[in-house]
Amino acid sequence: MEISSFTQTVDAEFAPKSTYLNTATCGLLPRRTVEGGVKALVDENAAGAVPGGGSFEVVDRARARFAGLVGVGPDRVAIGSSVAVHVGLIAASLAQGAEVLVPEGEFSSAVGPFAARGDLRMRYVPLDGMAEAVRPTTSLVALSSVQSADGRLADLDAVRAAAAAHGARVLLDATQSAGWLPLDAGAYDYTVTGGFKFLLCPRGTSFLTVTEEAQETLRPLYAGMMAAEDRWGSVYGPVERLAGTARRFDAAPAFLAYHGAEHSLALLAEIGIDAVHAHNTALAARFRTGLAGIGHEPVPGRTAIVAVPGLGSREPALARAGITVSDRAGNLRAAFHLYNTQADVDHALEVLAD
């Protein structure tokens, strides 16, 4: 997308009233999502209009939109309400004693369901040593593409190669990258993604992708009508026939969130992930350069999330200046997305320089 078209499209959808650099916590909702999705369903519900409570067709359109963004078919996508729901499904399907390899400091939703079982062998290693740590006894490697605490990018090619060499499966949490970093979800056995950050969806949207081969390893824990081949024919009694696709792993959707998600995902498809990636990483690079110029050393990398170790205590002062960032693990964390500008970067640098 041309720069002028990019700017016009973004300006038509967003009007932040502060310097919002906190998409790694929660993304802003586009105007079309609020008005054409969420508010429209709320109004229908209030009036008792059909479909009122929500539409399976809308959920399936959101599924297809997400699939298009991550390079798989809709038949490889299951929906839910949180990353932990999907990770819990995978954790429940592992054999007793299976070895799970995760990075130290990984976000809790990606590791907690495995650790909570109590009968799995958990191994924690530094992020930059993940590939070397895979061994023949490893059953699953679980990691985020971009770390929540500091924005570091994992060496995903090396991890996949090591896992393949030792017969281990890979679970990728793309919550902090989907929406700005190009992703080929089909290259992983499983991916999980929360929709409320860089995908700009309302909270309550999440997506699981699973390859056709890896699908056979999972148990359909949420086998209600959403997981049935014939939804409306499976309202009562046990589901006689599960969907043959990844939809068999669907959890009950928060319809209000998915009615909005359809529009948010359509916006990202219109703009293009490559264009968003170029925009976001350029702003992040400007911020890193500016930080170095005022005596701060950010975590290096070409990522849309910038973290400065030991500077998290400045978050309240930035908030008073109208700048929204996060304090994560002692890091000052700023995240850049399509609605941010160079003026946002410069405003944050000006306050930090005082």
Each model region followed by its residue ranges:
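Pyridoxal 5′-phosphate
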Residues: M1-D354
